[in-house]
Design a protein with these regions (language model features):
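N-terminal low-complexity, intrinsically disordered "leader/linker" segments enriched in small/polar
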Residues: 1-40
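Disordered, low-complexity "stalk" and linker segments at domain junctions of extracellular
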Residues: 25, 55-208, 212-216, 220-225, ...
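Short, surface-exposed charged micro-motifs
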Residues: 31, 40-41, 71, 202
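Segments forming glycine/polar-rich beta-alpha architectures that bind adenosine-containing cofactors
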Residues: 44
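Short, surface-exposed beta-strand/strand-loop-strand elements in extracellular ectodomains
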Residues: 50-51
Length: 236
């Protein structure tokens, strides 16, 4: 044989016609990936990430920040990609957005003092955001004016002239204002200074953390909080 086109030579020396291919779904697709655990197949069309079904139908699950190719990884039952993850039911952004709040003093039952107040948001999966910037207000009670699109918001306050924040109340985010007039007695705040993990070119999970390569920097999440990182030290 001097020349052969579209022919494979097998181990026993015989010839076999090479399988062909055909167009089954036109479109500008990229970032095709199969989750090795769940078996789900993902493909992006422009900036829209889809789940590809066996019948080749597409189900949009997430809006990427650009039409650039994305990396994937499987970790803790989720499929992660640039800026988000898929939990088997829906796509979600990495990390819950921190709520914004304005505070005004009102008459209440707290001892007169200087109180620190910070808020976190909670999504429908029970995941908590990083805390808002601590604001200090003088008085005996406070009215919070909240802006958040999550199902719930948690308010943390210090003791009068204290520094440690404790949970005072969890309230529906649809409640645009709320008054705190009694001392906090809940859990201590543990998400101060944390932000959603940044987007990058490569994402991997290991040992209770997510790792994101962003340019020449490697960012890593807090342990057992894979969607939040501390920008003060969570990178190399």
């Amino acid at each position: 044989v001097r020349a052969a086109v579209n022919v494979d030579l097998t181990a026993d020396g015989s010839f076999r016609r090479r399988p062909g291919y055909r167009l089954v779904k036109p479109g500008e697709y990229h970032s095709l990936w199969r989750n090795p655990v769940s078996g789900q197949v993902f493909v992006a069309e422009g900036a829209v990430l889809n789940v590809l079904s066996p019948d080749l139908s597409l189900t949009p699950v997430f809006e990427l920040d650009s039409p650039e190719p994305t990396d994937f990884c499987e970790y803790n039952g989720n499929t992660y990609f640039r800026g988000g993850y898929y939990d088997g039911k829906r796509g979600r952004p990495l990390g819950v957005p921190t709520p914004s709040v304005t505070i005004e003093p009102v008459a209440g039952g707290l001892p007169q003092g200087r109180y620190g107040i910070a808020l976190t948001a909670v999504n429908d999966a029970g995941e908590e955001s990083g805390a808002s910037r601590v604001q200090f207000v003088e008085g005996t009670g406070f009215r919070l004016h909240i802006q958040s699109n999550t199902p719930a918001v948690r308010a943390y306050i210090t003791d009068g002239h204290g520094e440690q924040l404790r949970l005072a109340w969890e309230m529906p985010a649809g409640l645009l204002s709320y008054q705190i007039t009694s001392p906090a007695a809940g859990d201590w705040l543990t998400s101060g200074g944390l932000e959603p993990l940044p987007k990058g070119q490569i994402i991997r999970g290991h040992g209770g953390r997510l790792y994101v390569a962003k340019g020449d920097m490697l960012c890593f999440s807090e342990p057992l909080r894979p969607h939040l990182w501390n920008p003060g030290y969570g990178f190399v």
